[in-house]
């Protein structure tokens, strides 16, 4: 029985131990399974992280590589642009140097030679007429043209490498033509390099094909390439860059103006040289006459015979000391020759730097006189200098300036008028507006007065009128401005002289007669303050009649403000407005006189004491000074004349 009890105890213990082991094994298996799952999860997370890091690093390397490529490309572009800019600047410098060395002078210096006359002891001979030698240059083209064509090669090949030069020339021309096509298509970045490459090849052939046309061709495209480079460097919008055709027209206009300025400078130099030589001749002649007079006076001191005057106006001086009884005579003709040598024998030479065109039926001396009336543009008057007169400026812009800048647009019914009249009370800027038109329109401008077309010789006035219109037609587009036109084209009557009548008739015929052509670009602009005195035929030809009246309130305010610019004054804005209101009826000239008189008021108060004062110690111009000046400076235009102008404007005026 004990044995059975022990045996059952052992069995129970073994079973319990087995159960415990099973439980432990189950627990261990559970934990092992959990550990296996975490391990797998950790392995998968690690793999995903590695792939993610790999893609991130690859993307970063790609971005860095792209950035490096961008900056490298940008550096290459900047380097190429720098090289092109340096190459272009070098070509410009070389081209200017070649022009200075190889270009032949266009004019030769005018020299005036005076041959000294040998005089005997008995007779004073007439001085010889001065001889002048002049050379002329070709006149600038009258209308803007396209750039000069590439000059053709010589027919004879003088060197072995002429074929290579011809191929190089053709290649350069092909590159420039391609660049021109890109230029017209607004592909400016691409055309600059082709321009530079083509010009570089042309400049390499300078020694073989050096001519004016060749230089002009290179100069035009050099200027175009330089202009495009500067505009692109500034970041200008492509549509705002001047296109090829407009640039060509502007280049030709500037080229013509440059030649005209050079001609005027050379004309002034030659005229001064001629005057100096003429004065030298006169001084020599006068010294010779004085010597003869001194000899005659010394002889007359011992003379016992009085001086007698004969009907032939010859003064005879007899000297008893003369061994052979010779008479020393000075005729009045010889003496008058000395006085009138400037007007008769010594004719004004033609300007050597201005070409004298060969015009059928026109004397060259008349043409020379007319060409001296071409206005000089050294001191130009611009639109901004003309204060107020907005309606007048707008009308002139439409009638004069725009048609000359775009002649292709203003054709047919848009063709500009051939005659224009500025009328109104004096002192309101009619002449100043004409000067502004002369500068802004960029055309040949003739400033004519009545003295320019009158002569003491019968028939010369009509010849001068004919020469004026012929020269203006030759240099068209051009403007003929006649100040105080009423002095030339007053109403014809039976009481006037025959010469005046012929002169008016010739002006009207040349203005718009049977020989005139509708395609001529010659505008006649007149200014007057007596429009009622003009002839009816002249009014018919002066189609556009613009009234330049007294300044209005706003214009008077602008004029006063413009005159006070740069002056030391204490006027407030309200006081300036008050001045503009109280000056109703004042012309532009009256306002200028008023401001000048007011500026003198502080100096009047100082008197002689101003010599000891500094400039900044002089008192400022005050409103009180203007009040004192208003008592002295009155309007110069009467109300009656103003009413007559307004009445004439309502009847015949345009605006």
From Swiss-Prot:
- Give the compositionally biased regions (Low complexity): 102-140, 262-320
Q: Which GO terms describe its biological process?
A: microtubule severing; nuclear envelope organization; positive regulation of microtubule depolymerization; protein hexamerization
What is the membrane topology listed in the Swiss-Prot or TrEMBL record? Peripheral membrane protein
The MIT domain sits at 169-232
- Annotated residues that bind ATP are located at 424-431
Q: What is its EC number?
A: 5.6.1.1
Please give the catalytic activity noted in the UniProt record: n ATP + n H2O + a microtubule = n ADP + n phosphate + (n+1) alpha/beta tubulin heterodimers
State a single Gene Ontology molecular function.
ATP binding
Which Gene Ontology cellular component terms are annotated?
A: centrosome; cytoplasm; microtubule; microtubule cytoskeleton; mitotic spindle pole; nuclear outer membrane; spindle midzone
Cytoplasmic topological intervals: 1-58, 80-655
Intramembrane stretches, per the record, are: 59-79
Please give the function described in this protein's UniProt entry: ATP-dependent microtubule severing protein. Microtubule severing may promote reorganization of cellular microtubule arrays and the release of microtubules from the microtubule organizing center following nucleation.
Q: Which family does it belong to?
A: Belongs to the AAA ATPase family. Spastin subfamily.
Q: How does it assemble?
A: Homohexamer. The homohexamer is stabilized by ATP-binding. The homohexamer may adopt a ring conformation through which microtubules pass prior to being severed. Interacts with microtubules.
Q: What is this protein called?
A: Spastin
Organism encoding this protein: Dictyostelium discoideum
């Amino acid at each position: 029985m004990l044995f059975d009890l022990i045996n059952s105890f052992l069995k129970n213990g073994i079973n319990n131990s087995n159960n415990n082991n099973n439980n432990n094994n189950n627990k261990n298996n559970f934990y092992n399974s959990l550990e296996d799952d975490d391990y797998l999860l950790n392995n998968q997370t690690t793999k995903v992280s590695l792939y993610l890091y790999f893609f991130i690093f690859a993307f970063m390397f790609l971005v860095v590589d792209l950035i490096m490529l961008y900056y490298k490309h940008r550096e290459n572009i900047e380097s190429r642009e720098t090289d092109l800019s340096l190459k272009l600047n070098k070509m410009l410098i070389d081209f200017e140097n070649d022009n200075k060395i190889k270009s032949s002078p266009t004019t030769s210096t005018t020299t005036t030679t005076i041959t000294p006359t040998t005089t005997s002891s008995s007779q004073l001979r007439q001085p010889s007429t001065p001889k002048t030698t002049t050379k002329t240059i070709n006149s600038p083209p009258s209308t803007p043209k396209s750039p000069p064509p590439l000059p053709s090669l010589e027919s004879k090949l003088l060197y072995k490498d002429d074929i290579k030069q011809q191929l190089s020339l053709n290649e350069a021309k092909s590159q420039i033509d391609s660049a021109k096509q890109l230029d017209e298509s607004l592909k400016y970045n691409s055309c600059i390099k082709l321009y530079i490459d083509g010009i570089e090849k042309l400049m390499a052939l300078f020694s073989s094909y050096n001519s004016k046309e060749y230089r002009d061709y290179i100069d035009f495209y050099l200027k175009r390439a330089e202009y495009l480079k500067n505009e692109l460097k500034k970041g200008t919008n492509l549509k705002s860059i001047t296109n090829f055709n407009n640039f060509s027209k502007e280049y030709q206009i500037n080229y013509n103006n440059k030649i005209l300025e050079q001609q005027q400078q050379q004309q002034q130099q030659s005229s001064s040289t001629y005057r100096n030589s003429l004065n030298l001749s006169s001084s020599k002649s006068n010294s010779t006459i004085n010597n003869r007079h001194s000899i005659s006076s010394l002889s007359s001191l011992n003379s016992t015979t009085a001086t007698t005057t004969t009907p032939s106006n010859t003064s005879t001086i007899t000297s008893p000391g003369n061994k052979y009884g010779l008479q020393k005579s000075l005729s009045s003709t010889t003496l008058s020759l000395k006085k009138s040598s400037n007007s008769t024998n010594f004719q004004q030479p033609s300007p050597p730097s201005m070409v004298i065109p060969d015009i059928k039926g026109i004397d060259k001396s008349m043409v020379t006189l007319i060409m001296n009336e071409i206005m000089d543009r050294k001191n130009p008057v611009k639109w901004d200098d003309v204060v107020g007169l907005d309606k007048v400026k707008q009308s002139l812009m439409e009638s004069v300036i725009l048609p000359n800048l775009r002649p292709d647009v203003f054709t047919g019914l848009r063709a500009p008028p051939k005659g224009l009249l500025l009328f109104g009370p004096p002192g309101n800027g009619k002449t100043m507006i004409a000067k502004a038109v002369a500068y802004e329109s960029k055309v040949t401008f003739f400033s004519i007065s009545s003295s320019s077309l009158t002569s003491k010789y019968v028939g010369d006035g009509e010849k001068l009128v004919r020469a004026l219109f012929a020269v203006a037609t030759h240099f068209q587009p051009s403007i003929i401005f006649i100040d105080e036109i009423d002095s030339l084209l007053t109403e014809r009557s039976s009481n006037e002289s025959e010469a005046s009548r012929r002169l008016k008739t010739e002006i009207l015929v040349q203005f718009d007669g049977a020989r005139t052509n509708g395609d001529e670009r010659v505008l006649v602009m007149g200014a007057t303050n007596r429009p009622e005195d003009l002839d009816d035929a002249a009014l018919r030809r002066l189609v556009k009649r613009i009234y330049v009246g007294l300044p209005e309130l706003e214009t008077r305010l602008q004029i006063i403000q413009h005159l006070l610019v740069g002056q030391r004054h204490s006027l407030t804005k309200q006081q300036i407005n008050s001045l503009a209101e109280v000056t109703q009826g004042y012309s532009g000239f009256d306002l200028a006189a008023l401001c000048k008189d007011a500026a003198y008021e502080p100096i009047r108060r100082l008197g002689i004491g101003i010599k000891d004062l500094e400039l900044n110690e002089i008192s400022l111009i005050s409103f009180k000074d203007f009040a004192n000046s208003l008592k002295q400076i009155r309007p110069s235009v009467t109300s009656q004349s103003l009413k007559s102008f307004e009445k004439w404007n309502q009847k015949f005026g345009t605006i």
